[in-house]
Curated annotation (Swiss-Prot):
Coiled coil feature spans: none
Catalytic activity: 5-hydroxymethyl-dUMP in DNA + ATP = 5-phosphomethyl-dUMP in DNA + ADP + H(+)
Protein name: 5-hmdU DNA kinase
Organism per entry: Delftia phage PhiW-14
Superkingdom, taxonomy of origin: Viruses
Record-stated family: Belongs to the thymidylate kinase family. 5-hmdU DNA kinase subfamily.
Amino acid sequence: MSNTLHEGFKFGDPGLINIRGTNGSGKSTIVKRYIPKGAVQKRFDDIGTTYYDCGTHFVVGRYETDCGGLDAVRGTYDPKTGQGIRPFEAGQIAIGRLAPLKTTFAEGVIYGTTFKGSKEVHDELAKTNTPYFWFSIDMPFQEVFDSVLLRRVKSGNADPLSTENIAKKFRPVLASLDKAVDAGLWTIYGHRDVIAQNVDDLVNNRPLTNADLIGRKPDLTKFNKEAQVWFDKGTVSPTQEMIDEHFPKPTTHGLGGFFKG
């Protein structure tokens, strides 16, 4: 476990806080807490990547939509010409520029599913003694699907959700964590609430509440069995209670004038 660079870390110092998890695991929710209203949105035009300068720290990506962070990085790649920088590469470059300056938050589903690119970033940051904090969210499938369904219902979509699509993205996140632990990277793995608490500890320079979870490996055998159950379900649907409470209500303001004689 590469703790040497992490032990003396103070929030605001150079460093990367990378939060990983599947759709609906709460990655963006955690990061949004650390984007103050006065944050200045900036952009690396050469790599097509936006980030927030929050004074003491940076946040990579955009957060105007639910799917933000690194998933909102567009890069400069033109599929018609095959030229430019792909979104994943652009995110890596942005992290490489920002994290050695001051604490940088980065999260995204796609970035979280790969180990090779993350290890490359880790090794590159290590050259400048920049610590890489790898936070991986462990969420029960039911909570993940409930979270995604709620988000969809709030946006006006009450259609059934494919269980296969999300389960497919979940396993690579855990597989990359498994490789990271084996490679000796600093990792911590726990439920969303636990990860949120530990990130807050780091931000406020407190000892980590759940330091015993550092280096914890995922149980991929158990995960595969649970994933198969959800694969077999095919789809899940929002409850009627969820729809009644959260589905956007139609508005009638401004219609009265049409009916006046």
